[in-house]
């Protein structure tokens, strides 16, 4: 009887120990399950952050691409404006050359006109001298008349040349007037171009400022990309570590669950053995 009581006490103690171990195993399994759930939550948060980082990286790259496209377009407009200014400067130079040639033609025509005027004055003087001497010598008169006719012819030729010079002068004046109009138009165009050039200069300054800002933004984007890439690598490392931890903890949970099942089976066997012992005692 004492042996049975001792056996019952030992079985009871073993039962209590098995229950304690089962409770401890359940508590440990619960804690491990909570750790697994926490790590899974951290893993989901990490994956969300990774997606956010990737989206921010794509957005930064798109903004950088847009800024580069705008900068290239503005540089193209500046080059076109510079080409137009160069072409207009060439046209102004051609107008100045035409004006110089017109001034040279006008100078030559003026000199010819002065020569014709001097010839006419000389012919008139000779004619007067011949008239004063006509009474002295008939032959001299004939000579003078011949000289007079020649002088008249010279005068007519001078008049003709004068008319031609005057006509050419009128043409030159017309050319000069057109050249002046073209020069004035060129000057007006220069003023317009200077204004456009000033605007282009201001735009160029704005473009330079935009370019500096774009470069700064590009540096900032590169820094952000570097940081985001670093954060991405860290997140991937943490994710890999979390996955390994989850796998490890899952194995531990499986082991504890197996141990719990084993303890429950052991507890069940002890309970059945106690029931059988009680039945045997009741038989006595």
UniProtKB/Swiss-Prot annotation:
Residues 1-284 form a coiled coil. Pfam families: Tropomyosin. Residues 12-38 have a biased composition (Basic and acidic residues). Residues 1-47 are annotated as: Disordered. InterPro entries: Tropomyosin. Keywords: Coiled coil, Repeat. Belongs to the tropomyosin family. PANTHER family: TROPOMYOSIN (PTHR19269). The molecule is in a coiled coil structure that is formed by 2 polypeptide chains. The sequence exhibits a prominent seven-residues periodicity. Tropomyosin, in association with the troponin complex, plays a central role in the calcium dependent regulation of muscle contraction. Homodimer. This is Tropomyosin. The lineage of its organism: Eukaryota, Metazoa, Ecdysozoa, Nematoda, Enoplea.
């Amino acid at each position: 009887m004492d042996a049975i009581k001792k056996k019952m006490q030992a079985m009871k103690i073993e039962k209590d120990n098995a229950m304690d171990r089962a409770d401890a195993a359940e508590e440990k399994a619960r804690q491990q399950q909570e750790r697994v759930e926490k790590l899974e939550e951290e893993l989901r948060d990490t994956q969300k952050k990774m997606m956010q980082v990737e989206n921010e990286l794509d957005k930064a790259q798109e903004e950088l691409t847009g800024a580069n496209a705008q900068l290239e377009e503005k540089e193209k407009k500046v080059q076109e404006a510079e080409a137009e200014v160069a072409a207009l400067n060439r046209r102004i130079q051609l107008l100045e050359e035409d004006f110089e040639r017109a001034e040279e033609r006008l100078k030559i025509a003026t000199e010819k006109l002065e020569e014709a005027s001097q010839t006419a004055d000389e012919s008139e003087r000779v004619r007067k001298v011949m008239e004063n001497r006509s009474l002295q010598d008939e032959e001299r008169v004939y000579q003078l008349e011949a000289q007079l006719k020649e002088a008249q012819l010279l005068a007519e030729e001078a008049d003709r040349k004068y008319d031609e010079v005057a006509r050419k002068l009128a043409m030159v004046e017309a050319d000069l007037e057109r050249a002046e109009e073209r020069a004035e138009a060129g000057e007006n165009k220069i003023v317009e171009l200077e204004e456009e050039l000033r605007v282009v200069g201001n735009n160029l300054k704005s473009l330079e400022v935009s370019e500096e800002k774009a470069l700064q933004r590009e540096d900032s984007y590169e820094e952000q990309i570097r940081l985001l890439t670093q954060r991405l690598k860290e997140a991937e490392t943490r994710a890999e570590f979390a996955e390994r931890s989850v796998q490890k903890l899952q194995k531990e949970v499986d082991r504890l669950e197996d141990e719990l099942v084993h303890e429950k089976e052991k507890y069940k066997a002890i309970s059945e053995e106690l029931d059988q012992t009680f039945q045997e005692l009741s038989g006595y």
